[in-house]
Amino acid sequence: MPEQSNDYRVVVFGAGGVGKSSLVLRFVKGTFRDTYIPTIEDTYRQVISCDKSVCTLQITDTTGSHQFPAMQRLSISKGHAFILVFSVTSKQSLDELSPIYKLIVQIKGSVEDIPIMLVGNKCDETQREVHTREAQAVAQEWKCAFMETSAKMNYNVKELFQELLTLETRRSVSLSVDGKRSSKQKRADRIKGKCALM
């Protein structure tokens, strides 16, 4: 199938086992699996509103290993927005995002207009190695947004993708294609002037 030029491409990066696939599957299909199945690369699609017409939100769930640097570079070069996922139970998983962030900057040049979300997943777990303040400091250093999520508990999953689209300033994108929005979403839409989520 030829790639559509009006696809809005979101790329999800992070170490193996941090819950990248779980976040994507929870968002796209509303499901959660307890077993860990390593991903090489999967792509999921969902219809969204983009510049007042219908287009496809294409979410690329990347491998957690560093065995495929060419695939990483290709995903970054084609990506419009990025989700950098770590597990709050693993400081190493946060540290492993630094070279990926630097690669995004290297390939994209300025990331000033590129939506990037730093995501602390598994916030339902009690054995934390990364505290909220520490992750917020990294996000501030990288000049990106930060959010904690739990794919297992379905906490902040929809909000993560809404916020990512809200950060988009180059064009108007929305997960809503039928025009129905809550009053809270309408207010946020007026404030940002860009996105709303259904």
From Swiss-Prot:
Modified residues (Cysteine methyl ester): C195
Source domain of life: Eukaryota
Motif (Effector region): 36-44
Its membrane topology: Lipid-anchor
Subcellular location, record wording: Cell membrane
Propeptide feature ranges: 196-198
UniProt-listed InterPro entries: P-loop_NTPase (IPR027417), Small_GTP-bd (IPR005225), Small_GTPase (IPR001806), Small_GTPase_Ras-type (IPR020849)
Keyword Transcription regulation among record annotations: no
Protein keywords: Cell membrane, GTP-binding, Lipoprotein, Membrane, Methylation, Nucleotide-binding, Prenylation
Binding site for GTP: 17-22, 33-39, 61-65, 121-125, 151-152
UniProt cross-references to SUPFAM superfamilies, sorted A to Z: P-loop containing nucleoside triphosphate hydrolases
Chief location: membrane
NCBIfam families registered for this protein in UniProt: small_GTP
Family: Belongs to the small GTPase superfamily. Di-Ras family.
Name recorded for this polypeptide: GTP-binding protein Di-Ras1
Gene: Diras1
